[in-house]
Design a protein with these regions (language model features):
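Structured, active/binding-site neighborhoods that engage oxygen-rich ligands
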Residues: 1-226
């Protein structure tokens, strides 16, 4: 693939976004409406997407992930906003794919950005790999938003706050990625899967090996799968 196209299993038009962007828009709207982080409002908006197609590019919910759906069902039944499962089998990429509004909104307060990156995952994806992937990716985004260059934020020594990852260590699987695993691999070792560790690695591999958005996006897309 060398340009944006339509089609696929959902027969979308070129430029129509899918589930992860819908959820990112829900999260962004919640931050705006609540003037900050409110987990319950986020979950209510995610449910509205599921039930009514809120923030969908087609007007209907489609391609909802199993882990997300189970968390929304639990929230509907209990009212508990932190309904994400902790099992390793639930370590999908749903929470990191919608993450961007958190570091953007809290870009002037890195401590809050990292705290809420973790909490934003726990609403639907509470496995430690999902939570730590969100913390790590939020740190990278914070660095870029503050003007740091790619080499700096992808260094294994980089931290958005002095000693943050020393005082708040990442789990082993995410720490390996942060230490640069993506710099020494190529497909098929790099996979566009729905597993959060492989998704994080694939995103960083695409970023590391390209110099502009178009090239990076195409590199990720051409991995295939999720």
């Amino acid at each position: 693939i060398n340009t944006i196209i339509g089609g696929g299993v959902h027969k979308l038009k070129a430029g129509q976004w899918t589930d992860d962007t819908s959820l990112a828009l829900c999260l962004a709207q919640s931050l705006i409406d609540c003037k900050g982080f409110e987990a319950k409002d986020q979950m209510q908006k995610y449910c509205k997407w599921d039930e009514e197609g809120y923030m969908s590019s087609t007007g209907k919910c489609f391609d909802i992930g199993n882990t997300t759906l189970k968390a929304l069902d639990k929230f509907r039944a209990t009212g508990e906003p932190y309904s994400g499962m902790t099992e390793e089998s639930s370590a999908g990429n749903g929470s990191i794919m919608r993450l961007a509004p958190i570091p953007i909104y809290f870009s002037q307060n890195p401590e809050d950005a990292l705290k809420y990156a973790a909490l934003s995952s726990k609403t639907t994806h509470a496995n430690e790999m999902c939570v730590d992937a969100c913390r790590y990716m939020a740190g990278i985004m914070l660095g870029l938003l503050s003007g740091e260059n790619k080499k700096t934020v992808l260094s294994h020594e980089y931290s958005p706050i002095n000693n943050y990852f020393i005082n708040n260590p990442l789990c082993e699987a995410i720490r390996e990625v942060a230490n640069g695993s993506f710099k020494h691999k190529q497909p098929p070792q790099i996979k566009g899967s729905g597993y959060v560790v492989e998704s994080l690695e694939a995103a960083l591999w695409s970023f590391y090996n390209t110099d502009n958005f178009r090239e990076g996006a195409l590199k990720a897309v051409n991995l295939g799968n999720d």
